[in-house]
Amino acid sequence: MSSQFDQLKLWSVLVGDSGDPDLIKTLDVQDATTNPSLILKVAQEPKYQSMLTEAISWGIRQNGDDVQTLTFVLDKIQVNLGLEILKYVPGRVSLEIDARLSFNTEAMVQRAIFLSQLFEKMGGDKKRLLIKIPGTWEGIRAAEVLENQGIACNVTLIFSLVQAIAAAKAKVTLVSPFVGRIYDWWIAAYGAEGYSIEADPGVASVANIYSYYKKFDIPTQIMAASFRTKEQVLALAGCDFLTISPKILEELKKEQQPVERKLSVEEAKKLDIQPVELSESVFRFLMNEDAMATEKLAEGIRIFSGDTQILESAVTEFIRQIAAQEA
């Protein structure tokens, strides 16, 4: 019998959850996704220092002020990594805009346009790029503008059906609901020792989004993310995309037990689901009613923002060293 990895590929596109090109090329996945936390890890590795140095030198040559130079460098690092990753996957790579812009629609639009243009300028194929935008109301509005300009978006930090519906109404390319972080919240909030896979709240959240989308023929793709266990992955077999850590991917490659498809369009069509109408006020109210989604969205933005600031500090020190050498 084939591995669980190969069986999963019959129903879902598998995505590598890593910003490390050397690791990605060993995974045999279709797509790859990065985030500030992953990029920070890569930037701290000696083998990628030349890539970091090149990005810094490029940023300095743009002759911006200190803030602009830092922005140029951070985006160039992402593009460098993204282009390197695309050498090893046949599909797309997701690059993320600065999480500190999460509540500023216009700033997110401008940053995403710059990132997309830089990606193309450096030789990237725009069709192979997804821009990751946080699932705030402002982020979803930014994604709507970008999609209308031909820039494909991955709306990330999805913790609720209401976010997913809002993103679908904005006609975004893809959403990323976070299985493991939802699971973590329920464990912490209620002191549970764990949930069976049948009762896993993270798995249930993604399944609900999948059912809603397929019931109403919504073309927005679903890329389940943030898995804690192999069992969570298998429980969502059939989801459009599954973005999986290298550790769990290796576990799937070693196991050969049969994999059963859990999600299908045919089954979703049978469900009694009513369409939801959303305005900004309804979106904000429903998010406010969902403590888990509100808290995890805020936490996710803080984590990505914090890692971006750490990366900025490292880059600032590199810039200072380069300036001192050239003085």
From Swiss-Prot:
GO biological process: carbohydrate metabolic process; pentose-phosphate shunt
Entry annotated with the keyword Chaperone: no
Example of a GO cellular component annotation carried by this entry: cytoplasm
Chief site of localization: cytoplasm
Example GO molecular function: transaldolase activity
Known function: Transaldolase is important for the balance of metabolites in the pentose-phosphate pathway.
Record's protein name: Transaldolase
Natural source organism: Chlamydia muridarum (strain MoPn / Nigg)
